[in-house]
Regions:
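Positively charged n-region of N-terminal signal peptides that target proteins for export
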Residues: 1-4
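Repetitive helical segments and hydrophobic/amphipathic motifs
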Residues: 11-12
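C-terminal motif of bacterial Sec signal peptides marking the signal peptidase cleavage site
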Residues: 15-16
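N-terminal maturation segment of proteins
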Residues: 20-568
Length: 568
């Protein structure tokens, strides 16, 4: 399924050239890369708009204002691979790296476009549904001038066409036996119902402030137009989707994980591999998770005693009682282990509560690549996490410094060919941001180091057990009893209620934690290998610089790019 708006990392960049790749006339490698970037931007209005303030400067023509295509099959990746391969023998240096990254990216796309996997993606996943993505795209839409308001209204008006595509997809999904379970359908409908009123959209627009001149009368008129567009298009579209889900909700054959479906095991493995950008089998991934589980469990068992347990259960406050003070603290400390970036302008703003989950503390909104606007961290004032907690500190490290905000700003200064900024391996992006949370545990003030070490080991153990449970459910047909036994084997005794909640979450969203926890494990393995390879010459700062030195890359290539960077 197409991700309408990537809020996490690296889907953006700038370019100029002609609007279609000139396949019949051989151009230079860099010209070709610029051409396919333009093609991608012209085929994806939302990515183009969120990436560029002035697309016209790069000869990018807006073809259609819309949410795109549900199946995201408007690009011939096999043709791209063939054209890319025609340049292979002439490349050297950095161009070889660029070639490898793009070649792997398009190979993974071709693999997932296999007809046998068609209609297996759950576009109504309660944790990442297409309707929630539509809402997020509208709530985060950027207004640089009055024409953007007009385009915003056109985008809303296009919503019904996108929803009709979704309805056709759901119908076919039901016919193929891949429709979500009735329980997941009910969860999805709860979130959809929240969007079936214009208030969230209209109130969000009315709260906007604009950097350009707009009279109160005009803003009020545009607010009325937004409401009319919602009532004319978006609401009827959502209604069609709701009717389709109600119609097909009892046709599901997916009550016990993907392993029970035709091609389910193959799809699960292929999808995990494509999220990470690796060729490793699920068995090899399980080995990584088992190793981390054993290491973490052994540490906990050998270090936890009554005195330390008491300290852990006591109040563990960082003393930082605002989100701003947390980020300021991180900005002062991260330079111990990460290369300093020039001053990063950022602002903290509240999430729109119409689209916020109480379990979500914060997220990072990527700025454009041809502008100098402020980085934005959205925070949830109604989060269940206390602002002065270690969890809040590590989450903000994940989203800001030295996590996604650092990632994005470092990548932007690399000046690579533009198309490389459309590469988005979540296994790398989220694996890196999860990896830097280890440093957050190190940096967090006012909490004893032995407490932080135990709590971090518990986090690592949970990473491993979640991955083992995920693979167990969707590849090995684990029951709830199997999952409970797995956790008990590592002295994590969950109640049946806790097991049911965990099991259902992984059943509903098979890939949700994969990029975070498996990505983390791969990065830690690369770090271990580099420590062994370099010995006394190894430093965390050099390794962390090497991790971001090539931007977003498939993990299969990450170790070689890290080696190249650290051995220069």
């Amino acid at each position: 399924m197409k991700k309408i708006l990537l809020l996490i990392i690296s889907v953006f960049l700038i370019v100029g050239c002609s609007s279609q790749p000139q396949e019949n006339k051989k151009v230079s490698f860099h010209q070709y890369l610029r051409q396919i970037f333009v093609e991608d931007m012209e085929n994806d209005y939302l990515t183009m708009h969120s990436s560029l303030i002035h697309p016209e400067k790069y000869d990018i023509e807006v073809k259609k204002i819309s949410f795109g295509n549900i199946d995201d099959k408007n690009i011939n990746y096999k043709k791209r691979l063939k054209t890319l391969e025609s340049y292979k023998d002439s490349l050297s240096g950095s161009d070889k790296t660029y070639y490898k990254i793009l070649h792997r990216t398009y190979e993974d796309q071709v693999k997932m476009d296999d007809d046998k996997y068609e209609y297996m993606d759950n576009i109504c996943d309660p944790n990442n549904s297409f309707t929630e993505n539509m809402a997020t795209s509208l709530l985060e839409f950027r207004f640089d001038n009055e024409n953007d308001i007009k385009n915003y209204i056109k985008l809303i008006e296009s919503g019904i066409d996108y929803c009709k595509q979704a309805v056709a997809y759901l119908k076919k999904q039901s016919e193929e036996g891949y429709f979500m379970s009735s329980r997941v359908s009910s969860e999805y409908l709860q979130s959809l119902n929240k969007l079936m009123t214009s208030s969230w959209l209209v109130s969000s627009f009315n709260k906007r402030t604009f950097s350009f001149s707009l009279s109160d009368e005009k803003k009020e008129k545009y607010g009325e137009d937004v409401k009319k567009a919602y009532e004319k298009s978006l609401y009827p579209g959502f209604k069609l989707v709701k009717e389709a889900v109600l119609k097909y909700k009892n046709t599901s054959k997916n009550a016990s994980g993907l392993s029970e479906l035709k091609n389910g095991k193959s799809y699960f493995e292929a999808r995990v591999q494509s999220i990470l950008g690796v060729d490793d089998s699920l068995s090899q991934m399980k080995e990584k998770a088992i190793a981390l589980a054993k290491q973490s469990s052994d540490y906990i068992q050998s270090h936890l005693n009554a005195e330390l347990y008491y300290k852990i259960t006591a109040s563990n406050s960082t003393g930082l009682r605002t989100y701003r003070s947390v980020i300021q603290d991180l900005l002062q400390r991260y330079q111990e282990d990460f290369e300093k970036l020039d001053h990063i302008n950022y602002e903290i703003s509240a999430m729109d509560q119409s689209n916020a989950s109480s379990s979500t503390l914060a997220y990072y909104v990527n700025p454009t690549l041809d502008g100098k606007e402020t980085n934005i961290i959205r925070v949830n004032e109604n989060s269940t996490q206390s602002k002065d907690s270690l969890d809040a500190y590590s989450t903000l490290a994940h989203e800001s410094i030295p996590g996604h905000m650092y990632q994005f700003n470092y990548a932007r200064m690399l000046k690579r060919p533009e198309i490389l900024y459309t590469v988005s391996y979540l296994g790398y992006a989220e694996g890196y941001a999860t990896y830097v949370q280890d440093y957050a545990y190190k940096y967090a003030p006012h909490i004893d180091s032995d407490v932080k070490d135990i709590l971090l080991a518990e986090q690592h153990l949970q990473y491993a057990l979640v991955i083992l449970s995920m693979i167990g459910i969707h590849n090995d047909s684990y029951s709830k009893t199997d999952v409970k036994r797995l956790w008990s084997d590592y002295q994590m005794n969950l109640s049946f209620t806790e097991v049911s909640s965990l099991y259902n979450q992984m059943l509903d969203s098979p890939f949700m934690m994969c990029p975070y926890y498996l990505g983390y494990m791969y990065i830690k393995d690369i770090q271990k290998n580099m420590k062994s390879k370099l010995g006394d010459k190894y430093t965390n700062k050099a390794f962390n610089k090497a991790l971001v030195a090539n931007g977003n890359v498939p993990i299969a290539l990450l170790e070689s790019t890290v080696i190249d960077s650290m051995e220069k």
